């Protein structure tokens, strides 16, 4: 007997209008927000970095890859090229904590040169200045600050240049507040200047970017002078005697290290010049008392050798006779 087939009809259930929708739109919206955030981040970075820093960032991105192990961990913030130090909050001023990498360098960790090994005194010869420069270079290499410190031995003394790079800014943009890295660097250099009794010149330098009108009367002259004085105060706070400083100068943009690119970060710097004794005497002659200087002696000798006019001799004789008569009358 043939089996009968049964047809089953299933009534579709009508969906209500208040049934919740799926979450696919949330994923799309999240992607949109991430893209928008990335856009604003790129615009912000382009605003805060200069031309040289942009070149360095582009070169780094072109030369590195997340798949290349030779470039290390891409999430390592210690090697970040970001203008903001992701390893620490750069908005918080330094409290001079000795745990900082720069300050702890001279706390007896056992690596690098010993500042206490320097014999206190005046460094005048080229050999002495070269040895002092070597100590500073080894210290900066130990703390990975080679790109921020340049030491040069000159006939007049030792020139130490502290400058910006694309990783570290010395001061807040347009201000005279030291960033924590350079503040600790100056505090670490202070014990060295305590041992070296040579006079010190501190000069501040800016780039050629002028201040906008909204800043009123502020200028690169005032800014460079303020930054140089902040460097002096930091060194004194670190232990350097205040009488070591012979001159604090603001140079504005009149001595550019990179004149081809006046707006370059190389031009924003602080220079510490350790003067030899002869160079310090020359500076004293220019700005100090010149009564006993060679120039004054030569001037007096020239005046003494000038020919005397007859009328001046007669007037001098008459004045002398009057003075003698007054004395006799007394």
UniProtKB/Swiss-Prot annotation:
**Record's PANTHER family?**
LIPOPROTEIN YIAD-RELATED (PTHR30329:SF21), STATOR ELEMENT OF FLAGELLAR MOTOR COMPLEX (PTHR30329)
Do you know which Gene3D superfamilies this protein is assigned to? OmpA-like domain (3.30.1330.60)
The gene for this chain is: lafU
What's an example GO cellular component term for this entry? plasma membrane
Task: Identify the InterPro entries for this entry.
Answer: Bact_OuterMem_StrucFunc, MotB-like_N_dom, OmpA-like, OmpA-like_sf
Database matches in SUPFAM superfamilies: OmpA-like
Q: What is this protein called?
A: Chemotaxis protein LafU
Alphabetically sorted, this entry's keywords are: Cell inner membrane, Cell membrane, Chemotaxis, Flagellar rotation, Membrane, Transmembrane, Transmembrane helix
Induction pattern: Under conditions in which the polar flagellum is not functional.
Q: Does the keyword Amino-acid biosynthesis apply?
A: no
Q: Domain named OmpA-like: which ranges?
A: 158-278
Keyword check for Transmembrane, yes or no: yes
Membrane topology per the record? Single-pass type II membrane protein
């Amino acid at each position: 007997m043939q089996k009968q087939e049964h047809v089953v009809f299933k009534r579709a259930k009508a969906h209500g209008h208040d049934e919740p929708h799926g979450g696919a739109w949330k994923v799309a919206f999240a992607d949109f927000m991430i893209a928008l955030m990335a856009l604003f981040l790129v615009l912000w970075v382009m605003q805060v970095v200069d031309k040289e820093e942009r070149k360095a960032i582009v070169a780094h991105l072109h030369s590195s890859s997340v798949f290349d192990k030779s470039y290390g961990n891409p999430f390592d913030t210690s090697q970040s090229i970001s203008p903001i130090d992701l390893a620490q909050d750069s908005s918080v001023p330094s409290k001079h904590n000795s745990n900082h990498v720069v300050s702890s360098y001279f706390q007896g960790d056992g690596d690098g040169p010993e500042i206490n090994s320097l014999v206190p005194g005046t460094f005048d010869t080229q050999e002495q200045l070269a040895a002092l420069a070597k100590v500073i270079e080894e210290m900066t290499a130990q703390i990975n600050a080679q790109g921020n410190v340049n030491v040069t031995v000159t006939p007049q003394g030792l020139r130490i240049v502290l400058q910006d790079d694309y990783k570290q800014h010395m001061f807040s943009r347009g201000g005279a507040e030291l960033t924590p890295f350079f503040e600790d660097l100056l505090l670490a250099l202070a014990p060295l200047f305590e041992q070296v009794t040579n006079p010190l010149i501190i000069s501040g330098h800016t780039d050629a970017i002028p201040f906008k009108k909204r800043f009123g009367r502020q200028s690169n002259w005032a800014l460079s002078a303020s930054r140089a004085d902040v460097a002096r105060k930091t060194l004194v706070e670190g232990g350097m005697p205040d009488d070591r400083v012979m001159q604090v100068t603001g140079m504005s943009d009149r001595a550019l290290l990179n004149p081809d690119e006046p707006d370059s970060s190389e031009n924003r710097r602080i220079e510490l010049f350790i003067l030899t004794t002869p160079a310090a005497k020359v500076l004293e002659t220019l700005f100090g008392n010149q009564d006993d200087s060679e120039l004054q002696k030569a001037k007096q000798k020239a005046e003494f050798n000038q020919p005397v006019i007859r009328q001046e001799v007669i007037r001098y004789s008459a004045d002398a006779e009057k003075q003698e008569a007054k004395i006799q009358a007394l």
